[in-house]
A protein has these predicted regions:
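ATP-binding N-terminal substructure of ATP-dependent carboxylate-amine bond-forming enzymes
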Residues: 1-143
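Rossmann-like NAD(P)H-binding beta-loop-alpha module
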Residues: 146-151
């Protein structure tokens, strides 16, 4: 189901709309430590089971969610307010995720670091593309730990 096929209630809420399920005292954090209050939209690259758990918890805390995953039956995409069905490196899909989201994260470390870098130019992104790039390369990861003094 594309966003255009979802019911109107699944669209990004208008300014000042009530967050789903009332929210919580614990908030997501955007750049410079500014909190993202319930009612904000959290974007996720990846729509697997970890993404689904993230989406459920975010919604329980009062956040809206947007998932980018090419699989039309991705577990997170099925429960998210928005499901952008495209690949991680699709420029239009990344732009749509940035448009819908107030901040973006990734479900797991195997998304292209370049996609996170693209999003980071538009929205707060965590983890950083550079951190994901290190996590994707075991030799680089070991060198990074040595440089940080980790035995």
């Amino acid at each position: 189901m594309n966003d255009s096929d979802k019911p109107l209630s699944a669209a990004r809420p208008p300014e000042g709309a009530q967050a789903p399920l009332g929210g919580s005292a614990t908030h997501a954090v955007a750049s410079a430590g500014a909190p993202l209050l319930p009612g904000s939209t959290l974007g996720v690259l990846g729509g697997g089971q970890l993404g689904r758990m993230f989406v459920h918890q975010a919604q329980a805390m009062g956040y809206f969610t947007a998932v980018l995953d090419a699989d039309p039956t991705s577990p997170a995409g099925l429960v998210s307010h928005h499901h952008i069905q495209t690949g991680y490196e699709d420029a239009a899909g990344l732009a749509e995720l940035a448009r819908l989201s107030d901040a973006v994260t990734t479900e797991f470390e195997n998304v292209p670091a370049a996609a996170l870098a693209t999003l980071a130019a538009l929205r707060p992104v965590s983890p950083a593309a550079s951190a994901v790039a290190v996590a994707q390369d075991r030799a680089q990861e070991k060198a990074h730990f040595v440089a940080c003094g980790v035995p």
